[in-house]
Design a protein with these regions (language model features):
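Conserved helicase ATPase motor motifs in RecA-like P-loop NTPase domains
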Residues: 82-88
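Extended catalytic-interface subdomain
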Residues: 326-328, 334
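RNA-binding accessory domains that recognize and position tRNA/RNA substrates
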Residues: 1-53, 60-66, 70-71, 76-78, ...
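Short glycine-/small-residue-rich Rossmann-like dinucleotide-binding loops
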Residues: 57-60, 329
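Catalytic metal-binding/acid-base residues of hydrolase active sites
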Residues: 175, 329-330
């Protein structure tokens, strides 16, 4: 469904910035649609996309390096409003005839900015303010027609503009929270300079997506692999709103879900939303498949391959199915090589939602979330009426508990881990809920982003009552993160850790010890396998 971007949108040219996705999200937070495109896009290709404004991202390179990313000079002559950040300011300067050089010392972190003269970018902001810098190079001479609009002690040209041509730029990063007036600057650019309207709202999005799905599907039938995760659940609710019983969801229960999950899927989709749902009980099939398998990647491969076999077995029993809906989201597209921009961006990792169609079987794809970031998917789910405990649930890997059991997967180990994990989630859910009540922020500084139990393939000696025990330990993993790229272990209160440990040892048969994994990512990964 990626062909239908809004008429007015911002194209973010990505020069390799660590904040590239953040820029796009900040624009969307202001109710304007934005899309990331590769920096080597040509002016002709950009003209075909037809954006209403451009943002040039930062990047790690020096503009004079041999392999430094460049911009097609004609892009700056298209007559579009342009806002460049950091490297974006530098590339704008050198492309238009200015110069960039090394500063005497780099500028990293908070910096004291002083405005110089009037600028529409700085409307409504203080004469002096704190901004976030991350650079060694800086513009030393502005192009013809440009004026300097702000400076710092280290960077005399901290912002510049050619207002007549709607070209604006800053050496600092307006998109990060540490720039105290960054949101105001973005707002000034979008609404005062570009004249955007706030059309990127959930109500508008739902109305638009429902109409798109109806137009594409017509009288056809759609099938969806429903996992109970956030993405597939939101797709199910959205597609069902559009076409009702023309949608059939297939829920493959591989026996490695968390406690209560199959029941929750049944409750929400069969009873609350009245979605046609096929619940495939494949627990025994998977138990036989995984017997004796210990290598993590083999577990993943077997589970994934078998999932699609089971799914397509069910799909082929249904008559008239033409479409397959799935929960591809925008970061998937970016990480798989910027599919929507001609595949020019480097591939970071293979797309996790690629479908292995059996020979002779093919469905047209419907991907209604492929323009959305994860936080937008959650907001969409709430607007569609999905319960918040489903929408705001933490990430859960497709192979399920199988990759949180170190070694082979057995019914006994699954039972132990499922019960221990339920206690971990219950206790930390309550802790996060308390933080939300106190702060009103689901992502407050101390909230836990992901948390679960791991069952290692060892036993340990213990004492329970007057008797020696030889039972399994459980490892608690709880991390703080925003994007899973990096993570730190959560500094949970001792009282909470004590309660979790006591409950697991007391309530879960076969466990006599609880350990807490305090390793950040990197060097560790969040999951153990």
């Amino acid at each position: 469904m990626s062909e239908s971007r809004p008429k007015q949108f911002v194209a973010v040219l990505d020069f390799g910035a660590q904040y590239g996705q953040l820029i796009a999200r900040r624009v969307r937070d202001l109710n304007v649609y934005s899309e990331i495109v590769p920096c080597d896009i040509s002016a002709d290709e950009l003209r075909e996309l037809n954006p209403s404004a451009l943002i040039l991202s930062g990047g790690p390179a020096s503009v004079y390096a041999e392999d430094a990313p460049k911009i097609d000079p004609e892009i700056l002559e298209l007559g579009l409003p342009v806002f460049g950040f950091c490297y974006g300011q530098q590339i704008m300067a050198v492309t238009l005839g200015g110069t960039v050089g090394h500063t005497e010392k780099g500028e990293y972190g908070p910096a004291h900015l002083t405005r110089a003269g009037e600028s529409r970018i700085f409307d409504g902001t203080a004469e002096q303010q704190t901004v976030w810098m991350s650079h060694r190079d800086a513009v030393s001479e502005v192009p013809e027609g440009f004026t300097v609009t702000a400076s710092t002690d280290v960077c005399p040209i901290a912002a510049m503009e050619n207002a007549a041509k709607n070209l604006y730029s800053t050496q600092f990063h307006p998109e990060v929270n540490h720039t105290e007036c960054g949101s105001q600057m973005l707002s000034n650019f979008l609404f005062n300079i570009c004249g955007f309207e706030k059309t990127w709202t959930m109500d508008n999005i739902i109305e638009q997506k429902v109409e798109e799905i109806r137009q594409k599907v017509g009288d056809g039938r759609v099938i969806l692999a429903l996992s109970g995760g956030v993405d597939s659940s939101v797709v199910a609710a959205l597609v069902h709103r559009a076409i009702g019983d023309q949608l059939t969801c297939v829920f493959v229960n591989h026996g490695m879900l968390r406690k209560g999950e199959p029941e929750m899927v049944e409750q929400v989709f069969r009873k609350q939303f009245n979605v046609p749902l096929i619940h495939v009980h494949a627990e025994q099939r998977y138990a036989e498949l995984l017997a004796g398998v210990t290598e993590p990647e083999m577990k993943r491969r077997l589970i994934g391959t078998e999932f699609w076999k089971v799914f397509f077995d069910e799909a082929q029993k249904l008559d008239g199915v033409q479409f397959l809906a799935q929960g591809t989201i925008y970061p998937d597209i970016i990480e798989s090589g910027a599919r929507k921009t001609g595949g020019k961006a480097a591939t970071i990792k293979s797309h996790h939602n690629l479908i292995p169609f059996p020979e002779g079987v093919h469905f047209d794809l419907i991907e209604p979330l492929d323009h959305f970031f994860k936080d937008e998917v959650r907001a969409l789910g709430v607007s569609l009426g999905l319960p918040e405990n489903l929408v705001y649930r933490q990430p859960f890997p497709g192979p399920g508990l199988a990759i949180r059991i170190i070694g082979d997967v057995t019914p006994e180990k699954l039972e132990i881990l499922r019960n221990a994990d339920a206690i971990v989630r219950e206790e930390i859910d309550a802790y996060n809920a308390q933080l939300f009540d106190e702060t009103g922020n689901r992502n407050s500084e101390h909230s836990v982003w992901q948390y679960f139990a791991v069952l290692p393939d060892i036993k340990s000696v213990g004492v329970m009552g007057d008797e020696r025990t030889y039972a399994r330990p459980v490892i608690l993993r709880a991390v703080e993160s925003s994007d899973a790229m990096t993570a730190d272990w959560a500094k949970l209160p001792y009282e909470l850790l004590t309660r979790i440990s006591s409950r697991i040892v007391s309530e879960v048969a076969g466990v006599n010890r609880v350990a807490y994994d305090i390793t950040p990512k990197p060097p560790a990964t969040i999951e153990w396998e």
